Amino acid sequence: MENQHQKFISRRNFIKTSALLGGTAFLGTGLPNIKKTYSKELDYVGNFEYPLAKPENILYSACLQCTVACSIKVKINNGVCMKIDGNPYSAMNLGENLPYDLSPKEAVSIDGKLCPKGQAGIQHAYDPYRLRKVIKRDGPRGSGKWKTIPYDQAIDEIVNGGNIFKDIGENQNVEGLKDIFVLKDPKVAKAMADDVTKIRKKEMTVDEFKAKHKDNLDVLIDPNHPDLGPKNNQFLFQVGRIHNGRIEFTKRFVNDSFGSVNWIEKTTLCGQTSNKAWVHSTREYLEGKWTGGIKSPRPDHRNTEFLLVFGSIVFEANYGPVQETEPITEGLESGRLKIAVVDPRLTKVASKAWKWVPIKPGNDAAFALGMIRWIIENERYDTKFLQNATRLAATNSDEPSYSNATYLVKVEKDGRAAKHLRANEIGIGTEKEFVVISNGKPAAVDPENSNLAIQGELFVDTNLEGIKVKSPLQLIKEEAYSKELAEWAELSGAKQKDIEDISKEFTSHGKKAAVEFYRGAIKHTNGWYNGQALIVLNHLIGNMNWQGGISNTGGGWSYIGDKEGQPYPMANLHPNKLSKFGVPITKEGWKYEESTLFEGYPAKRPWYPFSGNVAQETWPSISDGYPYKIKAALISSHSPMYSLPGGHVQLKTLLDTEKVPLLIASDIVIGDSSQYVDYIFPDLTYLERWATPGQSHHIRVKVNQVRQPVIAPLTENATVFGEEVPISLEALMMSISEKVGLSGFGKDAFGPGKDLNRMEDFYLKLVANIASGNKQGELVKAADSEEMELFKSSHRHLPKTVYDIEKWQQTLTSDEWKRVVYVLNRGGRFASSDDAYEGSFIKKKIPGLARLYLEEIADSRNSISGNYFTGYPKYLPIMDMAENLINDEGEFHLITNKEVFGTQSRTITNYWAQLALQPENFVVLNSVDAKKLKVDNGDKVLVTSTSNPKGEHLIAADESRPTIGKVKIVEGIRPGVVAISTHYGHWGYGARDIQIDGEVVKGEEVRGLGIHPNPLFRLDDNLRGTTLSDPIGGSASYYDTRVNIQRV
């Protein structure tokens, strides 16, 4: 593979255009020249002093080859990134991390752990297909024809609009961003936002709103529906992988400066249902409201004795292999840990397990409810924990948390469990108090009353003052008992004995057992209830906040300045900030019934009150113009055509200039989706930019890694607010702000005398907050003269466009600057791995309750079917949004997965990892199925589905390719299930020929090898090309498709 790649890129003229990195002097005739530089520098012998072991050649940063954002140690020579390892200061990458006060000069010889993707990040940065200049389409959208244009011209065109494509024969007057930025007055925006909230709560009518705001109704999308918000909302920013820091920078632009609600991330393509189910299942009850919650509790792997894994490939993906592999392996090696894995595919961790149960995809709740039945029948639940109804009761019984297992639930006449009973409803307390049965009588419960220690009865089915009530555990018992254990086993595809054995083992380790789950369990239409059932298993043994149980992350020091004494409260440092308001294009965070669009059921499209960042709903909603039209969209680090199930169906929307008149991308390459836009502005890779990502879910101590530029930027420069800076997403947003006149950027952006002219003016303030700590007495040390000199020498290769030390110092006080240097010299701020525990408990606890019943879910409806959701775990078959059963013909059930060396799009450039280890993916079958199909390893097969009966993947207006892949036969997959991994089968990213300024840039065939499974996934027949989705958590379905396979 390496020789093939060298042969390709050694041709001097393979990329002639300077718009791409491979056509510049930096790479010369290609990447082998960099390799020669490596060899020239490192092949010395004798007394040669190894340059990569010198502290002045080391910079610390944060990875972005996957979501985990490992802390990294970047080794540089002559300005070139030569090697990437883990940062030994960080507990993310070294189990017993180095003392934070250890000098970087002493730390230089110690490396932390890093996965193959992280080490291959060099090729992400130095990809010859990287975009350096702004390009504009030179033909119809998706034609593959481009031309370079000056940065300032591109900014002028997207801001001012007009007939900007007349040179290619298009006669369309495009509204520029300045024409969409209509609501400009912060006072008007605030008043309107407040009143839309009143409309939402039914405290104000639309007529009253219109009368009050009669002088400004022209700024609204539709004055008859003020809750759609201002015309500003017709600007969409959709982003994929983005981390803290950059999140706040872009939200500052989209939400606070431009005033659009449409900042949409890609989370429902990832683990959103898991996140939201955990958040609601760990909330606190404060001042009469459920609030807070933790989105991603995980097992304390270092102390767990029994780990039950559902649909999570912990050695290959999740959050992430670097953090999970070591404690799990140590536990297996020492005999401390026993593992069971419930997954249709034999994952790496399943190969080490005591039991592997190849479940039927989508039937995780059936297996979990079988376990719950066995646990209740055999009384193996933690009675003491579940009975504790208040925090004081938990404290008195030496428990760090408590549950709502005993909080009575009202049962409607039709048998539907609704909201919790409140004490005022039966005359024993207030509307903010719950009711339990304690000592045979109803008792009012305020969960946080520090003087109240109450224990409730677990199984209750009674009437109080004429109101039918049941306890949450009673409702769960009834669901679990609705089928015999043998029936649950049959539904799940497991053996009854496996359910019994695993249930017994799970309840044999006290608090030191845990259920871990992720995408495999929740990326289904029934994903919410699957996830909730697995969460309840953890709650039944009361393992929350215990060593070896389910625990919170260690968190970090606040980067946004919301702690007392921190120098930069970023939310308050934005004069003339606009108040965003209105329904997002995805209808997320809103109940259909509270909007003025409510006209009974079904709604025109789904609404997602309990989810956010519903990526798969974005483009179908744009296509339908519901709830309104989008006039301009900016896409960054996101590839909807590649990452969305059925994304190819939405290609027609991207290509339609009537649907989205102005389509812009900020991208490092001409990608699988950015190839269809009007303008592409080059962006920086993670080795050239800033962020403050936050830590992995699996670390129990504070971690604040800081992403900072470690190599010179490889994009062209531009002048923004009088400063020469590299073209990037930040520069693009700042240039738009400068041209349109938005608040929050440029002169006095943070307040009088506090400018935001360069991205460092923003990001260094975040680092200063981290250095300050969360409370008094937590300041990091100030860098001494030796550390200051090291800082200067290690940054010596960076140009002033990204490292102007005088301007860096000017954006902070002298004292803040020295402490920021101390943090940057270590790549962030890190607590010792010894700081994770307090006795038998996790030190940083989940503050809320273990909630077995979610009344807010039970009190809400599916916007399409009109039926109520359920507040406790239940078994549901696979259904569309209208609750029609999906019972497709198709011989095989399709699932997907990741390899440890691959991540969606960006790792296709990694010749050292993905392409060297496995240049293409496979259609993975069990040998039983291969015999039926009469296929062998390497045979090509066509894969088809109900939603794609011809097996065609549309990649252009008039071009498609077949969904054909090579067979790989394994024993480690359930018969009847077929697996196709992601991160292959590209048609952008340098995989095909394109044309720039009349020159053909040849694609590299190896980048397009393999089969992409997403075009095969089942679509919702009622929603015009939208994938099946979970109506509560909002996740797109990746595991509910049946396919047929035919040898070709």
UniProtKB/Swiss-Prot annotation:
SUPFAM superfamilies xref list: ADC-like (SSF50692), Formate dehydrogenase/DMSO reductase, domains 1-3 (SSF53706)
Reactions mediated catalytically: selenite + a quinone + H2O = selenate + a quinol
Cofactor section: [4Fe-4S] cluster; Mo-bis(molybdopterin guanine dinucleotide)
GO molecular function: 4 iron, 4 sulfur cluster binding; metal ion binding; molybdopterin cofactor binding; oxidoreductase activity
Domain of life: Bacteria
Signal peptide: 1-39
Span of domain 4Fe-4S Mo/W bis-MGD-type: 56-129
Classification via InterPro entries: Asp_de-COase-like_dom_sf, MoPterin_dinucl-bd_dom, Mopterin_OxRdtase, Mopterin_OxRdtase_4Fe-4S_dom, Prok_Mopterin_Oxidored, TAT_signal, TAT_signal_bac_arc
Keyword Ubl conjugation: no
Keyword presence, NAD: no
Any one GO cellular component localisation term in the record: extracellular region
Description of how the protein assembles with itself and partners: The complex is composed of three subunits: SrdA, SrdB and SrdC.
Role of this protein: Component of the respiratory selenate reductase complex, which catalyzes the reduction of selenate to selenite. SrdA is probably the catalytic subunit that reduces selenate.
UniProt protein name: Selenate reductase subunit A
